[in-house]
């Protein structure tokens, strides 16, 4: 038996069973915690694996219990939940303590930044048809308290998403304390505003119901007024109230993304609708256009972010392979050119031996300096301390930030600012509604209006950016360069053909000249073989005058007579 135990230990170490998580909507911290829990369960109940000789295998099979028993191993997450629930029931002392603890923990989300969703995983297996926002069936309106988030999504998990999204990626700090932000969002009034705003936007977009939406808006106004009228307020609460529209926009967005992971919410229309609604309800003004571009979507929409990150990583791998091949070819083509460049100064300095020795000394000194600096740098790196966790996190955040392309501005004229009247005292629709319906005092005083120029319209998404213009310009330049190279090659082929044709003509001409030259030499040689007659030159002057008067015909006859030999004389 000890031998089999050793074999089980060997199986665990050599063939570990790694659990695979298919629910990408859960945060990374939650997934890591779930993996640790399942691994602990596997260590406590190791799987049986038959490894060894045939004798050991047969002995192991003989020792197997063949009786039918129900499966002893359950899901690790379900078992952990059952044990945790039983432990809570044992520790509770009385019903009064139970009620007190329920009241105290009703709106508490301690440790939500590191919290992971366990129960939602089990419920989502049977609620796949409701993962689309368009097909979800809304339950009845609860007038006593806000309805919970759909599909078993825990509210504290959403609080953790917003808290992590408010953290600066490089410094890792919030605009206020993380605990203060967590405590504020999990308190009763912001929680009610959050949930009712979620359901109001859900009904506004997918299932319009004016009566139900009016009830939701009424409760939102009451909780917002209660939040403002509560005194005293700390400095952090004042800062949180100023950023409340942005916080609620992120909260509603991450709730939609996590509750309905099969729907697509990464659109300009949906995000601008959420931001405009929250800002108009609370402050009465529109937010800056496209303020959602600076959100941390790795925390607000983790499933889509991981998918895009994986696709981008694959594109980078393919581009890196192409670039490595291109760089290798380029380096191979540059090697002979570099050798030729290095050869010229040697040939030019061959005539002066003094210059050659001085250059050799300089090269040796430079090499010694380079070696010394390299040694010093190596010693410094050994002496330096290891980077801390914060430095590693900042470097990872910068790498992640550099992985995604930076946003480029639109290559067009910015939209004109519009003039709107703004009330200095503020006119929040929620407060106005609360005062009109629940306040006993009438509004007094006057409105002080000023002209406020704001940017209400944004450039359309189809507008090309400077990056697009630069890429199109580079593509056109590359295309023109290719066309020029093709024209250059065509030009050289035509010139080569023309040179070849001229060479053929010249060869034919030289061949014909070689055939003509012997014939001319033979005729010239034949002409020199004949002796010219002397009697022709001693003719009388009367005959010459007659010949001159006789015309060109007789002259030609006399010229012909010079070429005939004089055979006989009378």
From Swiss-Prot:
Which is one Pfam family of this protein?
FWWh
Q: Where is the composition biased (Basic and acidic residues)?
A: 87-99, 363-374, 540-562
- Positions carrying Phosphotyrosine are 343
Q: Which domain of life is it from?
A: Eukaryota
- Record carries keyword Phosphoprotein: yes
Cite the residue spans of the region called Disordered. Answer: 87-112, 336-374, 519-570
Provide this UniProt record's keywords sorted from A to Z: Phosphoprotein
Biased composition range(s): Polar residues: 345-362
So what family is this one in? Belongs to the FAM227 family.
What name does the UniProt record give this protein?
A: Protein FAM227A
* Organism of provenance: Homo sapiens (Human)
Q: Which gene encodes it?
A: FAM227A
